[in-house]
Amino acid sequence: GGGGAPPSPGRSSELSGVALTQKLSEKRAAFEERFRATFPGIPSEGGEAEDVARYGLSNMLGGIGYFHGRSRISDQEAGPASQYSHYWEAGLFSAVPSRSFFPRGFLWDEGFHQLLVWKWDRALSREIVGSWLDLLNANGWIPREQILGAEARSRVPDEFVVQRTTNANPPALLLPVLKMAEHLRGLPEGERGADPTHAFLEAAFPRLQVWYDWY
C-alpha cells in the first residue's frame, strides 16, 4: 500500500456533490460567455453553427499535449528505416491533428491550429509557437513530424518515422506569427512594448530568420 496522507475531508467536500455541480455550472457559463465574446460572428443562442464551432474549439484545446523524446532523422533523401541518427532529446508542447490517429505534432498543421488557439488564448499560442521554434537546428531545419517517444512511434508505419533533412513543409507556422504582428500594429504605439507578444516576437525573430533562410 501507499504511504501517502489521506485526502483532506474539507477538500473532498469542496469538489463533490452540490458544490461540484455548482462549480461545473459556473465554469460552463464562463466558457459560454468567453466563447461568444471571442467569436461574435457565429450565430449564438444554442444554434447548430454555435454547437459545431464550440465542439471544434474544444477538440482543438483538448488535443494540446506535451511530448518528449528524440526524433529519428537522416540527411539522405531515401533509405531504409533502420538507417537514422537521433535528434537531440527534446520536448514539444503542441496541438495535434487527431488525438486517436495522429497523436503527434505536425509542423504544417500547427500553423493552422494556432490561428484558432491565438484567438482564444494568446499566451497559450505563444508557448506553443515558441516550443516549435526550440526544435530548430543550426541550419534552420525543423523536423516536420514530431514522432517523440514509443507511444507516438506506435502510431506511425516504420517507413515514415525517419524525418529527412531534405524534406520540409510549407512554413505555415508564419501564419500565427503574422497574426501576432498584426495584433501589435493594432495597439497604440506607446503600449506595444509592454505587450508580452512584443517580447516574444523580439526573442523569436533570430530563429524565424534562420528558418526563413533555410527555405
Predicted regions and their residues:
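Acidic, mature catalytic/reactive cores of soluble proteins
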Residues: 1-215
